Amino acid sequence: MFTQLITALSYRVFLSIFLSMRINTLTNMADPQLTKLIQDLTAIRSFAQRYSKIIRDARDYVIDAGKTGRTKLSEAEKAEKTIFGMKVEAYLRYEFAWGKGPKLDFYFNCIEFDSKATVGKTWMVPPEAVGELCLLTLLDEKRSVYSAGVIRASLTALTKGKNQDKKRSVSAIGKQSIHWLIKDELY
């Protein structure tokens, strides 16, 4: 009985990993623009180290420990957490000399893409970014790590429901299709 349970759990874990890999592979093969963006971003010199500094700087800007006494971003107000995402976007654009796209946050090597950052568990995608490429940043303060990945924000990668701003969140299936450029890196 116990062996069957372990086998069933192992099979589920294997299947989950396999499907995630297949989704990423199929998505990348069918989306040359996504593939090119992944290649271009991973080719940037010291990308992860520079990204880490951006995360620290944006976090420190919002926390403003000397004037607020805070030590964690989780202690900030909701509006201030939004500023974290705005600072990540601005610092990325400056650090990597990316242009501003006509519709989205960035324009780099002939590809336009949006920036989404979260200190929670998911990202909110506005209507103008649906169907577009997004650079996702995830901050995990409890473990002092961050992750950054790229996704095509297709309707299948997003939840059906929308908030009052008509933003959708990345769905469970969408999270499986994220191509992680940086995973659980210390900031």
For the regions a protein language model found, what residue spans apply to each?
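Nucleic-acid endonuclease domains
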Residues: 2-108, 117-187
